[in-house]
Amino acid sequence: MGCDVSRPQRITVLGATGSIGLSTLDVIARHPDRYQAFALTGYSRIDELLALCVRHRPAFAVVPSTEAAVRLRAGLAAAGCTTEVLEGEAGLCQVASAAEVDAVMAAIVGAAGLRPTLAAVEAGKKVLLANKEALVMSGALFMEAVRQKGAVLLPIDSEHNAIFQCMPGDYARGLSAVGVRRILLTASGGPFRETPVEALLDVTPEQACAHPNWSMGRKISVDSASMMNKGLELIEACWLFDAVPSKVEVVVHPQSVIHSLVDYVDGSVLAQLGNPDMRTPIANALAWPERIDSGVAPLDLFAIARLDFQAPDEQRFPCLRLARQAAEAGNSAPAVLNAANEVAVEAFLERRIRFPEIAGMIEQVLDQEPVVPLPSLDAVFAADQRARELSREWLRRHGR
């Protein structure tokens, strides 16, 4: 896929009002000669989306409902902004696959991001993948579509982007063929890394969302606190880099300075370091194979002074064990894991369940739901739906 270098690249930002979307727009705004926002999408923060449209003047904006569209159109008209408003999943897929688009930032959180992200892949776009659930739910189908349609897939998660930067350019030949022994996926350990296990019963959503190093949305903050985020990233790494789960090792690194490492058979270990700011991987993927200024401050090694590492505690973080088991089982297991986790995290944020019950609920759903092949997108969503129903049934059974 080529683009006219005499004009700025047109970027669709799926999930523009979220943390990744806002960081993407920050990087884009630093390089108006290179990039322009073509389409911005939002879900519940319509006023924020309106402000972004007025500032960035995209051709399109997408919202989930007619009610939201009416509200956004009124605001745009009052501001003299000509952005056209589209609705629903059809609108998302339209702006993800439009002929004018050069790159798509896929940053819608959760299963809702799968169809529009896949639409971008099937249109052969350069896809900046921040929605890890797309690969967790439908890894085999997704990667096959990438190959068949000639899409360019660039990881945005700081860990996967770090691995990408530490890999040789021809890693698609196979990890053993390029001398990679294992992938070392770093994890901060989140806010509860040293909390006594018995005290986890009483932690609040506010405590779970107070990450020591990163600024993130509420859902991913809870996933980070439970280490389910790292489990989902393990599954994602297996698909992105064609690795078996045993080749991906999780390392707790509290400072979040080393974003991941690649261990080679000759004894070399390559690591990518940087301040914990998502604008670095976003800028890396936007400009790849070139480099651009991201607005992130240079890393001050003297201020850091030390880097610590430890093995993850699976008694404290059972979600990591469940995710590895799902990765090893393959087929529908990761999709079921993801769906059960989405329901459990929502229930925790609504104070309907306690923090340790997130893992307990997911484990019961995984035990109840048989592992089956997922030959189509319909099969993926059917597995997702069954897992959500089992999760809601668990909540009802436990009086939640």
UniProtKB/Swiss-Prot annotation:
Residues involved in Mn(2+) binding: D157, E159, E233
A Pfam entry, by short name: DXP_redisom_C
MF GO annotations: 1-deoxy-D-xylulose-5-phosphate reductoisomerase activity; manganese ion binding; NADPH binding
Membrane-spanning parts: none
Amino-acid positions noted as binding NADPH in the UniProt annotation, renumbered to this chain: T17, G18, S19, I20, N131, E133, G217
InterPro entries named in the record: DXP_reductoisomerase, DXP_reductoisomerase_C, DXP_reductoisomerase_N, DXPR_C, DXPR_C_sf, NAD(P)-bd_dom_sf
Top class in the EC scheme: oxidoreductase
Cofactor(s) in the UniProt record: Mg(2+); Mn(2+)
Enzyme Commission no: 1.1.1.267
SUPFAM superfamilies per record: 1-deoxy-D-xylulose-5-phosphate reductoisomerase, C-terminal domain, Glyceraldehyde-3-phosphate dehydrogenase-like, C-terminal domain, NAD(P)-binding Rossmann-fold domains
Catalysed reactions listed for this entry: 2-C-methyl-D-erythritol 4-phosphate + NADP(+) = 1-deoxy-D-xylulose 5-phosphate + NADPH + H(+)
Record function comment: Catalyzes the NADPH-dependent rearrangement and reduction of 1-deoxy-D-xylulose-5-phosphate (DXP) to 2-C-methyl-D-erythritol 4-phosphate (MEP).
Family to which the UniProt record says this protein belongs: Belongs to the DXR family.
Annotated protein name in UniProt: 1-deoxy-D-xylulose 5-phosphate reductoisomerase
Organism for this UniProt entry: Pseudomonas putida (strain ATCC 700007 / DSM 6899 / JCM 31910 / BCRC 17059 / LMG 24140 / F1)
Gene that produces this protein: dxr
